């Protein structure tokens, strides 16, 4: 299938036009309206520094239904230990930059480019992008960030520089999102770690239905998801 070249108009091609690997379109921009439209349609940007902007909608999609979250014994013990203080939206810029510095298994470099940093910091300022932080003795040692729309949290990246710090941040986020009535977390691509916590791969069509059930519909101004504050 052809790869669509985006133009200035805020539109994306039908998702079933994506390549088998999930690549749907190239180009466009990282403006808030385009990013929000993309997320609300089940699309996300992911590209290297030397690439044009690439837009993806993989099939299958890795998701975590909050009711299916599995807290294993070691992580439960870590949470009870209370070694880390977890906060929300206290250090968004620091978290996304720490994620950008985290080495990738695929090789050197980062997909969180300078343009991506600016785009998500702008989304954060608009109340759509959020961070979760794990602190140890006043130092940021782990965390994650993503986008909250309706009853879905779209996870983007996480980091840690102490054992289990990002896992504690994630588990704490799951608990608070469940209390706020969220339905699911979009994990985008599966990993053994995510699957061990209850995430599963679902067909793209099922994922889109889950988004609708969570109150997320295609829009350049979708409803903001409520987010914990502490």
Swiss-Prot record:
Record organism = Syntrophotalea carbinolica (strain DSM 2380 / NBRC 103641 / GraBd1) (Pelobacter carbinolicus)
As for what it does, the entry says: Functions in the N-end rule pathway of protein degradation where it conjugates Leu, Phe and, less efficiently, Met from aminoacyl-tRNAs to the N-termini of proteins containing an N-terminal arginine or lysine.
Q: Which reactions appear under catalytic activity for this entry?
A: N-terminal L-lysyl-[protein] + L-leucyl-tRNA(Leu) = N-terminal L-leucyl-L-lysyl-[protein] + tRNA(Leu) + H(+); N-terminal L-arginyl-[protein] + L-leucyl-tRNA(Leu) = N-terminal L-leucyl-L-arginyl-[protein] + tRNA(Leu) + H(+); L-phenylalanyl-tRNA(Phe) + an N-terminal L-alpha-aminoacyl-[protein] = an N-terminal L-phenylalanyl-L-alpha-aminoacyl-[protein] + tRNA(Phe)
Q: Does the keyword Cytoplasm apply?
A: yes
Name the record gives this protein: Leucyl/phenylalanyl-tRNA--protein transferase
Its localization reads: Cytoplasm
Q: Which gene encodes it?
A: aat
**Sample GO molecular function, one term:** leucyl-tRNA--protein transferase activity
Q: What is its main location?
A: cytoplasm
Recite the lineage of the species. Answer: Bacteria, Pseudomonadati, Thermodesulfobacteriota, Desulfuromonadia, Desulfuromonadales
Q: Does the keyword Transferase apply?
A: yes
Q: Which InterPro entries match?
A: Acyl_CoA_acyltransferase, Leu/Phe-tRNA_Trfase, Leu/Phe-tRNA_Trfase_C, Leu/Phe-tRNA_Trfase_N
Q: State which Enzyme Commission number(s) the record gives.
A: 2.3.2.6
GO cellular component entries: cytoplasm
Per its UniProt record, what Pfam families does this chain match?
A: Leu_Phe_trans (PF03588)
- Which principal EC class is assigned to this enzyme? transferase
Keyword annotations for this protein, in alphabetical order, are: Acyltransferase, Cytoplasm, Transferase
Hey, which family's this protein in? Belongs to the L/F-transferase family.
Listed GO biological process terms: protein catabolic process
């Amino acid at each position: 299938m052809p790869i669509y070249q985006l133009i200035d108009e805020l539109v994306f091609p039908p998702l079933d036009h994506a390549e088998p690997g999930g690549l749907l379109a190239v180009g466009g921009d990282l403006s808030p309206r385009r990013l929000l439209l993309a997320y609300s349609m089940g699309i996300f940007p992911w590209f290297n520094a030397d690439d044009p902007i690439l837009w993806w909608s993989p099939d299958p999609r890795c998701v975590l239904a909050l009711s299916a979250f599995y807290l294993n014994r070691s992580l439960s013990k870590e949470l009870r230990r209370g070694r880390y203080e977890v906060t929300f939206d206290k250090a968004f810029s620091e978290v996304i930059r720490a994620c950008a510095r985290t080495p990738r298994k695929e090789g050197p470099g980062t997909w969180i480019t300078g343009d991506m940093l600016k785009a998500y910091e702008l989304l954060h300022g608009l109340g759509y992008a959020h961070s979760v932080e794990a602190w140890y003795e006043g130092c940021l040692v782990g965390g994650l960030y993503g986008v909250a729309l309706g009853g879905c949290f779209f996870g983007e990246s996480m980091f840690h520089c102490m054992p289990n710090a990002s896992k504690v941040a994630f588990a704490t986020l799951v608990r608070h999102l469940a209390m706020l009535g969220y339905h699911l977390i979009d994990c985008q691509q599966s990993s053994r770690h995510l699957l061990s916590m209850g995430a599963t791969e679902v067909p793209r069509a099922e994922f889109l239905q889950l988004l609708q059930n969570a109150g997320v519909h295609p829009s350049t101004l979708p409803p903001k998801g409520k987010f914990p504050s502490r």
